[in-house]
Amino acid sequence: MKGYYNFADIEKKWQDKWEKDGLYKTQEETDKDNYYVLEMFPYPSGNLHMGHVRVYSIGDVIARFKRMNGYNVLHPMGWDAFGLPAENAAIKHGNIHPQDWTWDNIKNMKKQMKSLGLSYDWDREVTTAKEDYYKWTQWFFVKMFKKGLAYKKKAAVNWCPGCETVLANEQVVNNACERCGTEVEEKELEQWFFKITNYAERLLEDHKLLQNWPEKVKIMQRNWIGRSEGMRIKFPVKGSSEEIEVFTTRPDTIFGATYMVLAPEHPLVEKLISGTEKEKEVRQFIDRVKKQKEMERTSPESEKEGLFTGAYAINPMTGEEIPIMIANYVLMGYGTGAIMAVPAHDQRDFDFARKYDLPIRVVIQPEEREEELKDTDLNEAYEGSGHLINSDKYNGLTVKEAFDVMAEDMEKEGIGKREVNYRLRDWLISRQRYWGTPIPIVYCEKCGTVPVPEEELPVVLPRDVEFSPTGESPLAKVDEFVNTTCPVCGGKARRETDTMDTFVDSSWYFLRYTDPKNDKLPFSKENAKKWFPVDQYIGGIEHAILHLLYARFFTKVIYDMDMIDSVEPFTNWLAQGMVLKDGAKMSKSKGNVVDPEDILDRFGADTARLFILFAAPPEKDLEWSDRGVEGAERFLNRVWRLVADNIKEIKNTDQASLDVNSFNKNEKDLYRNLHVTIKRVTEDIGERLNFNTAISAIMELTNATYQYLNGVEKVNYTLIKDIIEKMLLILAPFAPHMTEELWSELGNDESIHIQKWPGYEEKALKKDEVTIVVQVNGKVRDKLQVSADIDEDKLKEQVLELPRIQKYTEGKEIVKTIIIPKKLVNIVVK
């Protein structure tokens, strides 16, 4: 055996053997309990980065640990292969076809993953850009279309000029495309949507089922869904049969509503201005506002602009005529596209009222204020709580009381009704790009919008396409794709040429892994029942809203189709931190990228894995350190030498079992250290996911073993054999190659990774002796080594016999003796 860990030879040897033996292949029929661990699958960019190494190493430790603990583990991997990044990269890299570019990248990244020693069942690999996968993405679309959950409408959409496509609201960050950073524009286009708003309440309500999700993630989702309880109230338009409906969370302030505001796009505007002297001026204003971006219109810093329409509404509670304005800060896509403006108690309304000299009426009196609050007292809106004033019979009621009483009265009088509203908007899934799942819809002049029959799926993405972005869907230029026959009447028809948002592909992939070869269904209910929901999901916090919300939505839709038994996809979710270098996220522009391939070439996979798991708790950001990597390498070589230096004696040990009762003190201490370590590592991996402290415990055990070997005259090699074998078993999930090699060198034929995880003995955890701190009047005066099970009288006796204690107690009265078992004795004297 060599005196050091030669990773270059050893790691490849075992990777090949594991693959040949099918060591990590998931068993379908077994009497073991099933466990499903999954890391978010990657977009095939071409190369792994350190963030990938971290998340996959975390998942791999859990998978290996669960296998050794007797579970039948599903640990698959696949590729989120469609979407803009692949298409943009293909264009950038010399007009290579996106499919070729993607397939090459998958091949390279798969090789890199294998070189990390990750225990994936590659027989279950899925690729979202392959027909055998996107056939079923289309199948789900058709099912959702038939249920009214997929629909097309004209909408103001976020348009990215850089990517030449539409973005969902969630993909716009600070008015820029999250992918390329280009400033986003608004366009009106016919687009496909999924009706995620139908599931808003369930998405909120079912957060209670996610006990093992980070609370901050649930808060982010709650804020995004934005549930608000309020009232939908009707304001009649003076001199007309028309009514303006508003949604408000503050019906208690209706007596302070002194004007109405409509979004410039509101359909009623046309009726109000048509043929009036205001028509020209209002139309010019509308044209100007339409050029403003939604983000710009709603920003608190943006100037509030408006115009009087010339029409009036009637406040249904006061009978008062109030002017109807249009303004840039009210959007048609939110609420009803109209608001009742209460300037005394809403800052935007206040700013607007001051600017256009509109009336301000205070209707909420702060509790702590003695004098009645008047509009002339206000420099800004009062948005706090209090009781009602200037509100007729409701005066004196608190805000909360008034909400309920006024809501009841308005419902009785038919003025309004209670309603729950959501900030969440339907999910826009249309993309005007090539590299995505074709939307399985045809348009027939006679039959209208028709879904492609399920038996005709998949609608195959053609290869011969000019996919450079022009703003129009590239598929629209492919006549043989576009021109088809109507599945209903057989007449001429045209295919939909938009493709789906890549988030659709990743919203159900975790279910396909349960039955990846099924060509009759996306998966069978029987197979899904065995594995679903995912027991442990791992991925970045940046996916808290987009991917995780969409995956939860899809799961509920599929549950309603009676295909699965769970309404939530992921029982436990771990959001791993980023890998930083020099305090910043790694990026080429910052010049602080650490290439995993370089690290694997220099140090090997086990060292890379060990460092990245040891350097920080998994949920925290990790600072890359070359010295830390070298430290991980040194530790692995210490373990290697521990085996190499003692292997001859260990193999010659003929005693089959340990005689614990014959141990001397040094042997007892080392044996106890072993079992304390097993307990700690078991709990750190299995309960807390604290891999860094688990590795630290193994390091401490290694040090203790060396200290024993170097400090005794006669070594108990039966004990050393037991310690080394168990140490290798608990180190195996972290350093799979080296432990496999050492396990084999010790004469074991079966892989270490299918061995039983070692248990710890409760009896061995107990100390035979404990150190007692001895105090006199609360000050430490001595320490005493005693038997762990000594009784209190005997302990007192031994304490009082200590010369240093007698020095402080002699000639004094002992008032009392305080004993904290196995820790402390405090003698109180006077």
UniProtKB/Swiss-Prot annotation:
Keywords: Aminoacyl-tRNA synthetase, ATP-binding, Cytoplasm, Ligase, Nucleotide-binding, Protein biosynthesis. One of its GO terms (biological process) is leucyl-tRNA aminoacylation. Its main location: cytoplasm. One of its GO terms (molecular function) is aminoacyl-tRNA deacylase activity. GO terms for cellular component: cytosol. It comes from the Bacteria. InterPro entries: aa-tRNA-synth_I_CS, aa-tRNA-synth_Ia, Leu-tRNA-ligase, Leu_tRNA-synth_edit, M/V/L/I-tRNA-synth_anticd-bd, Methionyl/Leucyl_tRNA_Synth, Rossmann-like_a/b/a_fold, tRNAsynth_Ia_anticodon-bd. PROSITE patterns: AA_TRNA_LIGASE_I. The keyword Cytoplasm applies. Gene3D superfamilies: 3.10.20.590, HUPs (3.40.50.620), Isoleucyl-tRNA Synthetase, Domain 1 (1.10.730.10). It is found in: Cytoplasm. Coiled coil: none annotated. It holds the Pfam family tRNA-synt_1_2. Its EC number is 6.1.1.4. A motif ('KMSKS' region) lies at residues 585-589. It catalyses: tRNA(Leu) + L-leucine + ATP = L-leucyl-tRNA(Leu) + AMP + diphosphate. ATP binds at K588. A motif ('HIGH' region) lies at residues 42-52. Belongs to the class-I aminoacyl-tRNA synthetase family. This is Leucine--tRNA ligase. It comes from Halothermothrix orenii (strain H 168 / OCM 544 / DSM 9562). The gene is leuS.
